[in-house]
Amino acid sequence: MPSKKKQSRTPSRLSNSEPPASPRTPASSTTSRDTDSINEEELRRSIEEASAAFPCLLGKSAIIARVADVASESIRGSKIWLSETSMVAASLSPGSTVSVSLASPESRFSRSFPLSSIKAEYGDDSESIIADEPGNYFVLTTVFSSSKVFKDAVRISLNLCYGLGCPVSGRTVFVYPVSGPSLSDQFNGNGRSRYDDVNHLSLLACKELCLELTPFRNMLQAKNAFESSYEQNGNGNSTPKTPANLQKFSSPRPKSPVSPIIEDSVFSCKQRFSSESSIDLREVLSNESSKKLLQICASSWLYPCSLLYGNFVSVPILSEICIFCVKRADKRPSDTSNRNHAFMINQETKVYLHHTLDLASEIQGRTFVQGLQFDEGENVGCEISKLGGLSKEYAILRDIIDSSSIKNSLSSLGLRPTKGVLIHGPPGTGKTSLARTFARHSGVNFFSVNGPEIISQYLGESEKALDEVFRSASNATPAVVFIDDLDAIAPARKEGGEELSQRMVATLLNLMDGISRTDGVVVIAATNRPDSIEPALRRPGRLDREIEIGVPSSTQRSDILHIILRGMRHSLSNIQVEQLAMATHGFVGADLSALCCEAAFVCLRRHLDQSSSSSNLPLEEAPIAESSSNMSDISSDSSDSASSCITISATTSGAQRSFSLDETVSLVADDIQNNGNSCSEQMLRKQGEHTLSVGFEDFENAKTKIRPSAMREVILEVPKVNWEDVGGQNEVKNQLMEAVEWPQKHQDAFKRIGTRPPSGILMFGPPGCSKTLMARAVASEAKLNFLAVKGPELFSKWVGESEKAVRSLFAKARANAPSIIFFDEIDSLASIRGKENDGVSVSDRVMSQLLVELDGLHQRVGVTVIAATNRPDKIDSALLRPGRFDRLLYVGPPNETDREAILKIHLRKIPCSSDICLKELASITKGYTGADISLICREAAIAALEESLEMEEISMRHLKAAISQIEPTEILSYKALSEKFQRLVHTDPQREEEVTQPGNKSRSLWTPLRSVAMFLRRHIAS
């Protein structure tokens, strides 16, 4: 009786972590010999034993945790989430690659291998060559942090759950970082290199991948155990309670460990993960056309991921989840070198799907080696680490970290190493990418500090979190502490500032002083507002060095574009890439990445339009538009972002953006699959014959939509106006081309002659003579960043805001040089100073600021100022001197030839009768400006419609009637201004007399007479 009573109490002691043991369960299910009865010491011994067989995939520093949650199946890719505390303790950065393995439930009671076989987790105990492969025990995945995960618990994605054999809730897992060797491991005490260490996992590119379909009958038990574990958790029935000897590394779980996400995912798993397939997959794979489509979809589904030989991967096929094993067609070599190699699935990887019989027949029918092909000469990590245009900054940072992170490297010589580096520059230039990429590939431990993550509402917790990061870095030297957006964490201390900010600054100052006594720790901070940082941080001993990353030059943009285009199928030649780099003035690395992304979408839309027009199957536009909108929101740092058929990874310094035919076919296949339709063999064959390739015209179209980041808040208008749209004024056109286009196209000529181009041009003349139109045309022809400013827009009622607006305008122009600043109606902005008697006015202060910006202490390099006015006599004389406005161009009314050209331009869009004579019209419109002629053409068209609304063309009488009604603009008062202010260098001597106004002839006659008078006066005086 007592025994029965004791047994009756057993269910009451069960926890909500695992289901009860069943008589018939696979290895993945919970048994009486599960890891609940294994303490931490035994688990550590198991890790040590397993690391001897797989040293590159498991080590003593592995994290011991339990499966607490399974993410929704909408999250694609293999991912695992740890608590923030575990991430910091293990020095893991979000997005790092880790290996995940299962502890063997029988390791305590037998002498079996301490890790659980994934093959056995699926209920297959048969012997095969895969049993000794690393993929049978380890799965490579990407790690992220989550505030919803408790300490010593993990949350896994559904794909990782399938890869591990569907472990039940509460199952013990080992998580181990598999990044490259740290800097401390590269040197021993004698300073000798240890690069020959075999315990390093190499990540190589895979060209071909062979997958074998796993028999569905072996997966029934795994499916039932996986479902029952979470169902029983939800009903309150679970496995026995965790013993006390494991409580020291297990955090308390919530009362309801199963979330609605798990219930949804399990329910979906029941629907899709079937042991009895509703279709014959062997028949599907035997059909070459359907097999080819499935292989393309599988390649897109698996990208990007890292695999090991022997891994199990899940692939959705026809609304069901199918499990494939990573194999190859030939027998594996006898050596064990593949244990140190993992392979990455990229855009070039070709996936081959086989069932068991098909794979066996293929092995017998081939005499050559068929298997996993690695690109041995190309290391994926090295390719990712290249940052375009930042080679100089990369070298500086490498010298600093190499000299500061190695213990006793400089202190033994009596030198003080650099302890802090401040990287500043505009957003999108690659500051964060530079720090993260270098720290990752140099091997040092990386600790990241983000303001929103450490700021807490409770007093003292923010400072404590910051202190824990620095303490962890000091215990894991060599280490780098990276502080992103330093201005948000440590702003300048001001009287009356926030108390939290002042406490954070004080804590950071103390921590920076503390690491000066610790060897092997370097602080790297990044900001785009260096003036907003606490000045005490920028003194020597804290942030000793400062690295400025500015807007890339044309050479740097070319380097960035070449790196981005390596991952894209394009048809651009080197000359076209250089032209694209020259045309993207002011673009930073993030802007160039966005430009390539937009060009890819332009090419994809063009390809889909062509496919839909030539195919009998209409393509739905809604899924494609949805995919395009989702694609722009993908971030490389987001852990929950779903992968897409077209993968575009955004990095600020030149992340690779690529797409190929595989993604397009996959996108179409997903669309057809979701709508329950079937894809025809003819469409697949037609799409397979052509390969998407981004052309130069795609980039030209993308440039109209992508603007430089620094110019987005400025009114940027580059109208589609060419020189052909401006009639006459050839002299003014030549002057503008010399000042704007020549410096871009003939830089060597200016350097050779030892001069610089004109830096400022003022156009003045009667209203309506195409001054603004020519400024718009020169901006469009030169394809430079064009900042159009109207004088009254810069004035503000607040004191100092007007001068600040002028200063900010020129700062943006310099940051996006070469650029053009166009001041329309500049006489309203730069009026003569001292007119008001009540002191210095707002216009006087704005004028002074404008003079300083045009020709002050800072030289304007790459910034051309073009201004237009019809009242040059109202402008301050200090602004008109050479050095500020080198050329003063009088834009007068057109002559007869110019009027004929203007009439031709305005009448080319209006249907005209054959009786219209442009030469006659030009002769009778003497004294009319370009604006008057434009009005004449419009009024003539209105007059034709007044006669009859069915009128199809205008005639000569309509134009003459309009001329008789419109009076020419008064221009006599402007001729005197041309004699006083015009200053230019004639570019066409043959037309000098025609271009020069009548007043200039009297001035040319007066010059020799004045010389003769001066000579006679000197002769008489002598």
Swiss-Prot record:
Alphabetic keyword roster: ATP-binding, Calmodulin-binding, Nucleotide-binding
Ranges of biased composition (kind: Polar residues): 9-18, 230-250
Tissue expression: Expressed in the whole plant.
Extent of Basic and acidic residues compositional bias: 33-44
InterPro entries on file: AAA+_ATPase, AAA_ATPase_domain, AAA_lid_3, ATPase_AAA_core, ATPase_AAA_CS, P-loop_NTPase
GO molecular function: ATP binding; ATP hydrolysis activity; calmodulin binding
Protein's UniProt keywords contain Chloroplast: no
Stretches for region Calmodulin-binding: 1005-1022
Binding site for ATP: 425-432, 765-772
Gene Ontology cellular component list: chloroplast; chloroplast thylakoid membrane
UniProt entry tagged with the keyword ATP-binding: yes
Stretches the record annotates as Disordered: 1-44, 230-257
Disulfide bond annotation, renumbered to this chain: none
UniProt family annotation: Belongs to the AAA ATPase family.
Record text on subunit structure and interactions: Interacts with CAM2.
UniProt cross-references to PANTHER family, sorted A to Z: AAA-FAMILY ATPASE, ATPASE FAMILY GENE 2 PROTEIN HOMOLOG A
Protein's recorded name: Calmodulin-interacting protein 111
Species assigned in the record: Arabidopsis thaliana (Mouse-ear cress)
